[in-house]
UniProtKB/Swiss-Prot annotation:
Domain of life of the source: Eukaryota
Family: Belongs to the amino acid-polyamine-organocation (APC) superfamily. Amino acid/choline transporter (ACT) (TC 2.A.3.4) family.
GO cellular component annotations of the record: membrane
This protein's name: Amino-acid permease BAT1 homolog
Cysteine disulfide links: none
Keyword Lipoprotein: no
Function recorded in the entry: May be involved in the transport of amino acids.
Compartment(s): Membrane
Organism whose genome encodes this protein: Oryza sativa subsp. japonica (Rice)
Gene responsible for this protein: BAT1
Taxonomic lineage from the root: Eukaryota, Viridiplantae, Streptophyta, Embryophyta, Tracheophyta
Amino acid sequence: MTWNKAPAADAEAGGGGDTGHARLRELGYKQELKRDLSVLSNFAFSFSIISVLTGITTLYNTGLSFGGPATMTFGWFVAGAFTMTVGLSMAEICSSFPTSGGLYYWSARLSGKRWAPFASWITGWFNIVGQWAVTTSVDFSLAQLIQVIILLSTGGNNGGGYMASKYVVIAFHAAILLSHAAINSLPITWLSFFGQFAAAWNMLGVFVLMIAVPTVATERASAKFVFTHFNTENNAGIHSNFYIFVLGLLMSQYTLTGYDASAHMTEETKNADRNGPIGIISAIGISIIVGWGYILGITFAVKDIPYLLNPENDAGGYAIAEVFYLAFKSRYGSGIGGIICLGIVAVAIYFCGMSSVTSNSRMAYAFSRDGAMPLSSVWHKVNKHEVPINAVWLSALISLCMALPSLGSLVAFQAMVSIATIGLYVAYALPILFRVTLARKHFVPGPFNLGRCGVAVGWAAVLWVATITVLFSLPVSYPVTKDTLNYTPVAVGGLFLLVLSSWLLSARHWFKGPITNLDG
């Protein structure tokens, strides 16, 4: 892993000596967005989207069901280590091509002239749909958490508490998205402030919860339980320990997504060819550390796994909510402290969704700038504050529409949000695959590069994505029925067929890949 010094001529070429601005001109693009983000702000957007409080909290049930403490404790590092290989490879490419288009632009440049249009088309659509799915799942998760907070605040499941209907939950989701679109319509200086505040909230929130919850709990699990207990009682008909461990990894892998935000924010980041890669790598690394601490802290307050997963408990089967609630109720006779803890998580999830919309809109802006989206001329326009305002509201609207299937079936909704993990990682892997194959000999690294390790790290990243794509498509319950079928391969396969057919029937005749907009 090395850092190359940028040529002086490049560093001085426009943009007040900013190397990212100079590199953007070399790539053929005008500076249309306000370049005002520091390396800290760039990191903050990715760290806030990864948001360990969001991913671990919302999928803690999955971790408990499939393997329990042992899977979560050690599986977190398995997923984290391989995620870092993906992040390192992406950071190396980002350093060479610091544009808002990110992944799809990289695929075009790395696959060669013959394959560039098709490669960027496939990568771009998997990336943007995956991002929309992330925003959908994050904000819907917040709506569901609000539902649980209201339930516990009004007496709990066993005390006559109010359980909001699915229509109320979707209304919460719509209101959250509306507020996120409004915030993302503000100038980038405001978003920079919110992003840094969100990162600080996530960091402090983890430390508060990992210390407070097990400290308050009157009964705590032993270290042996936290590090070695392997739960096989999943009520899913699955008995293979390896299979159970694999399914338990979903919590970790779902959490460790969204760090492509640092790449999509590069046209607004100072010296992006250096600071973009730093944002990606540091967001993953710090998330791995604080996420493990959060898992340990909460799991030390776990005693009775079947009860936590039981829909008849006070939190309606929402495991972490029940852990928080019981910890305070057992000591103080009231669970209000646990509800406040859930409020800390809710704020973190809110900021996660906010940053997701920011990343979505920059991707939509870049993709439409290259003519890949319907009504492209509308979506890549920027307002007087140099914000892609139309792309912001488009992203919010699509994320709302993607949540509507939840009104008919949560199974259908889960199929759609599965794209958030697998679909997005496919988009991550494609430019890395082109980097280690078609572009292996002619790739020109930027200031950050992996040196001789680049190809090996890249292959490790590609193989990991291929592995999780297969593993997370396996059945999660036996016997398999229409209600228990894992619809991930259906959703991801359906997206691939839709993108491929649109290419064959139409786009191949007019889409030529990324186009420059620099006059002269």
